[in-house]
C-alpha cells in the first residue's frame, strides 16, 4: 500500500494501486475500506485498521525524518491541469468532464468545478493522490453534466506551488452554422458537377453509337 502523511494539518492517506489505477483507499473519517469498483470488494477484503496503523507509523516517523533533514521544507512544484470529456460530446446527452491534475507535490491540493463562474458540488467525485514514477502525484476530478450550448465550465486548481489559482476552461465545441453565401457556393458547385456529368455522359453515348454503327457488318443486298 501507499502511505502519505504530512504536517501541518495532520493529512494522511492510505491507498492500494494496481497497474497505475487506484484499487481502494481507507476512509480515515469513517475508518472503512472504499473500493473503486464494488466487484473488487466481493472478491477480496482489506481490514481498514491495517491502513490506519500504517498512517500512525508514518506520523510517528515523520518527526525523526524532519530532524534528519534539518527541517528543510519540501519544494513546492507547480501542478499542471487538463480538462476533457469522457465521451464524445452530444448536446443534451449525459457525459462526464475529467480534470486531470499532474505533477502534484506536496500532495495537498484543492480542485473545484465552476459552471458559468459558479461553484458546482453535485455530481463531483475525485480520486485519492496517485503516485508517479518520479514520486510526484496526480489526481483526477470528475463532474457529471449534461452538455448545453449555454454552459461553460472551469476546473479550478489551488496549490502551494501556484502563485494564484489556475482555471482550466472547457466548453462544448458547436459547429458554426453555414452562411447563406457558403450554401449558395456549395449548391452552385453541385449543380456544375451535375451538368458536367450529364455532358460527359452524353458524349460517351454518342461515341458509343458511332463506333457501334461503323463496326456493324453490311446486310444482304
UniProtKB/Swiss-Prot annotation:
GO biological-process terms attached to the record: adaptive immune response; antigen processing and presentation; antigen processing and presentation of exogenous peptide antigen via MHC class II; antigen processing and presentation of peptide antigen; positive regulation of T cell differentiation
Q: Which GO terms describe its molecular function?
A: peptide antigen binding
Keywords from the UniProt entry = Adaptive immunity, Disulfide bond, Glycoprotein, Immunity, Membrane, MHC II, Transmembrane, Transmembrane helix
Report membrane topology.
Answer: Single-pass type I membrane protein
Tell me where on the tree of life, at the top rank, the source sits. Answer: Eukaryota
> Listed disulfide bonds for this chain?
99-155
In this protein, the residues bearing a glycan are 110
Entries under CDD domains matching the protein: IgC1_MHC_II_alpha_I-A
* Domain Ig-like C1-type, residue spans: 79-171
Give the matching Pfam families.
Answer: C1-set (PF07654), MHC_II_alpha (PF00993)
Residues assigned to the Cytoplasmic compartment are: 210-221
- Subcellular location, record wording: Membrane
Extracellular membrane side: 1-183
Primary subcellular site in the record, as a coarse category: membrane
**Region Alpha-1: which residues?**
1-76
Q: Where is this region: Alpha-2?
A: 77-170
Kindly list the GO CC terms recorded for this protein: external side of plasma membrane; lysosome; MHC class II protein complex; plasma membrane
Q: Locate the region Connecting peptide.
A: 171-183
Q: Which residues cross the membrane?
A: 184-209
Tell me the PANTHER family matching this sequence: HLA CLASS II HISTOCOMPATIBILITY ANTIGEN, DQ ALPHA 1 CHAIN, MHC CLASS II-RELATED
Family statement drawn from the similarity comment of this UniProt entry: Belongs to the MHC class II family.
Report what the protein is called. Answer: H-2 class II histocompatibility antigen, A-Q alpha chain
